[in-house]
UniProtKB/Swiss-Prot annotation:
Family: Belongs to the quinolinate synthase family. Type 3 subfamily.
Disulfide bonds: none
Catalytic activity, reaction form: iminosuccinate + dihydroxyacetone phosphate = quinolinate + phosphate + 2 H2O + H(+)
Residues given in the record as iminosuccinate binding sites: H46, S63, Y141, V142, N143, S162, H255, P256, E257, T272
Function: Catalyzes the condensation of iminoaspartate with dihydroxyacetone phosphate to form quinolinate.
Annotated pathway: Cofactor biosynthesis; NAD(+) biosynthesis; quinolinate from iminoaspartate: step 1/1
Entry protein name: Quinolinate synthase
Gene: nadA
Keyword terms, alphabetized: 4Fe-4S, Cytoplasm, Iron, Iron-sulfur, Metal-binding, Pyridine nucleotide biosynthesis, Transferase
GO cellular component assignments: cytosol
């Protein structure tokens, strides 16, 4: 489902009166429904969710953690996924047929995932096969549609997360000489660089021009799809320069969805879980600037008052589509379950699911 499809989805919209309810009343109702359903209901929440939502999550995590939890949970009849569309798709594919996955707001998409559609990817693969022959293995960030995961699974590849990208890339290079990395060029570039692959052996594939942007294709080992995260691309070298001038003692940690320039100028980089763990283990009184989604940064600020924490970009805003999952939508979704009329059910077609699972399972077996 593209971001346009998500934003214009014909799925039933939440009645407007939910927006008029007090926070206290909504929280009381959500808590009551959770108690009534017990283990029949499971609510996973991504770290980028608002506090008003994450307080009701049965588990909070990054994309890898939530994928693993979804796969292991066999008790819940309903999984109300507080994340974005591709995450709910992944949960549906990893859970059993008797489990129903629900997204509280079907408009909660991901612009990065939509930067690689299946038609463009098929065309790119044909061109790359003509150029390189059978020397390429595709990998896709889990921030991708089920169809892209299925494409990767069909061609012997695997999914990756920011937590395990390094280990999966190592595995992939044992399979083939070259990698096609979808859809986030920055995570692909940063991970490959950390493995010792020079930038001169990487090139961007432009899906609009349908060509590889290099004058020396024979040197290329990593083909990077021209996609990015609209949140993490807003962190810049200028942000870092201004911060260093203001406070030379501050440490900067960023997510690898940031550009290569930003990552190279930072003190550290890693997955959402890595960032959280690093801050938790940091010395009291230490100073940190964090380059990732604002809801998580604010949560870290509030939960670690003994440390000085700020956003690397003071003008950063939260992820727009992730924030479509709010307390009113969560309550509406749960009340529909209570009525026996679930809305926002996510169901990946079986043919797509079978091939996408190959890619997901290859990842999970190397994690």
């Amino acid at each position: 489902m593209s971001i346009f499809d998500v934003l214009t989805a014909s799925a039933e919209m939440m009645p407007s009166h939910y927006k008029d309810m007090s926070t206290g009343e909504m929280e009381k109702r959500v808590a009551a429904i959770k108690r009534a359903f017990g283990k029949r209901l499971f609510i996973p929440g991504h770290h980028y969710q608002k506090d008003e939502v994450i307080q009701f999550a049965d588990t909070a995590g990054d994309s890898l953690q939530l994928a693993q939890v979804a796969e292991k949970n066999k008790e819940a009849e309903y999984i109300v996924f507080c994340g974005v569309h591709f995450m709910a798709e992944t949960a549906d594919m990893l859970t059993d047929d008797n489990q129903t996955v629900i997204l509280p707001d079907m408009r909660a998409g991901c612009s990065m995932a939509d930067m690689a559609d299946i038609q463009q990817t098929d065309k790119a693969w044909q061109e790359l096969q003509e150029l390189y022959g059978n020397t390429i293995i595709p990998l896709t960030y889990v921030n991708s549609t089920a169809e892209i995961k299925a494409f990767v699974g069909r061609h012997g590849g695997a999914t990756v997360t920011s937590s395990n990208a390094r280990s999966v890339l190592k595995w992939a290079f044992k399979q083939k000489e070259r990698i096609l990395f979808l859809p986030d060029q920055h995570l692909g570039r940063n991970t490959a660089y950390d493995l010792g692959i020079p930038l001169t052996e990487m090139a961007v594939w432009d899906p609009v021009q349908n060509r590889l942007l290099t004058d020396h294709p024979e040197n290329i080992k990593v083909i990077l799809w021209k996609g990015h995260c609209s949140v993490h691309e807003k962190f810049t070298a200028e942000n870092i320069s201004q911060l260093r001038q203001r406070d030379s003692g501050i440490r900067i940690i960023v997510h690898p969805e940031c550009s290569r320039e930003v990552v190279s100028l930072s003190d550290d980089s890693g997955s959402t879980k890595y960032i959280i763990d690093t801050i938790e283990q940091a010395e009291p009184g230490s100073k940190w600037a964090i380059g990732t989604e604002m809801n998580l940064v604010q949560r870290l600020i509030h939960s670690h008052p003994d440390k000085q924490i700020e956003s690397l970009n003071p003008d950063m805003c939260p992820c727009l589509t992730m924030n479509r999952i709010d307390l009113p939508h969560l309550l509406w979704s749960l009340e529909q379950l209570e009525k026996g009329e679930p809305k926002g059910v996510i169901k990946v077609p079986e043919a797509v699911r079978t091939e996408a699972l190959r890619a997901l399972n290859r990842m999970l077996s190397h994690t």
